[in-house]
Amino acid sequence: VTEVRSYAAVTAAYWAFTLTDGALRMLVLLHFHRLGFSPIDLAFLFLLYEVMGIVTNLVGGWVGARYGLRLTLFTGLAVQIVALGLLSLNDPAWTLGLSVAYVMACQALSGVAKDLTKMSSKAAVKGVAAEGTLFKWVALLTGSKNALKGVGFFLGGLLLSTIGFVGALWSMAGMLAVVLVLALGTLRGDLGKAKAKVRGADLFSKTREINWLSAARVFLFASRDVWFVVGVPIFLSSRMGWDFHQVGGFMAVWVIGYGMVQAMVPRMLRGTVDAASGAKAARLWGGLLMLLPAGLAVGMQMAPSAELLIGGLLVFGVVFAVNSAVHSYLIVAYSDADKVALNVGFYYMANAVGRLGGTLLSGVVYQLAGLTATLWVSAALVALAFVFTLPLGARARTA
């Protein structure tokens, strides 16, 4: 019972964190777009957020396996509170260069916080899920997280237009402080601690399957973020004349829908019961995903419209959600119970590498060649992700 209670506490803290994470992204994007930042400037604001994700997942996975997941969770929440407080001190009178550098540093802290909290909850699920229910639990956690992140996007747009940038940051810091105090009171035990001593070398010695899967993850997430991070919100705002509410609202609906689909994937793929069937599903849905951005790019070149773009992105979201849920299940399925924090950390490090590449490409490709070009780049990245799922086997083999 304590294991399940611990897991519930970890998940609740992660949910609260996710709300602020989504809201913060919209706040920063819309607030600094309003102050006149270019698409490339905006991409740079999120750059260190993603870079820190790479480092944090790697080191955090090792710390979690060595000292337990309580430490990583509490640290994550505390760091986010500090990041929100510091960001509120940004002064519009500063020069562009100073503003970008300062916001990047605050976002770096927020990136550390996000990945410590995320890794804690993703690894905790292996300790409490009964045999045969793992896919359902992983998908439910991932799906609910994305749905809440979407609510956060909407919340960010709403807070910005009601209580302003600074008020929004302080209200979120206050909520997280309450959550941190509650988590300190409820979490006991050494959830996620490895039984054997964890060495530094364990960070990189993975099985072949985990290496292939992590490589696929890099390109899968880059394929989403190359249009999602800067391209689409700025396109809707500048080309389609949407206001903050509409952009925040659409991005929110997209991510909430994406999260709901993810949570339903185990029901859609009842045949996926182990790593072998999971690998087969990853190849099938990866092949399907490849066709979508390419088809959408052709459509947008022939007759560009907001309706086509939105319809295409919604379909992409559904198929992408299935891919992501299957990949998230496979990483836990290929892991040993006491090494799961290490493997999840390594795998989400790959996730962060993909998001970093996608974020950078999103600003650069959109500014140089427009939205259609970001869709073509997305199609190429999905093709690479698909290639890396081809060697996945029925169980993890040593590298």
What are these regions, as identified by a protein language model?
Residues 15, 83, 96-116, 307-322:
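Hydrophobic core of transmembrane alpha-helices in multi-pass small-molecule transporters
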Residues 56-69, 160, 261-279, 366:
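Helix-to-loop junctions at the C-terminal end of transmembrane segments
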Residues 279-327:
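C-terminal transmembrane helical hairpin of 12-TM major facilitator-type secondary transporters
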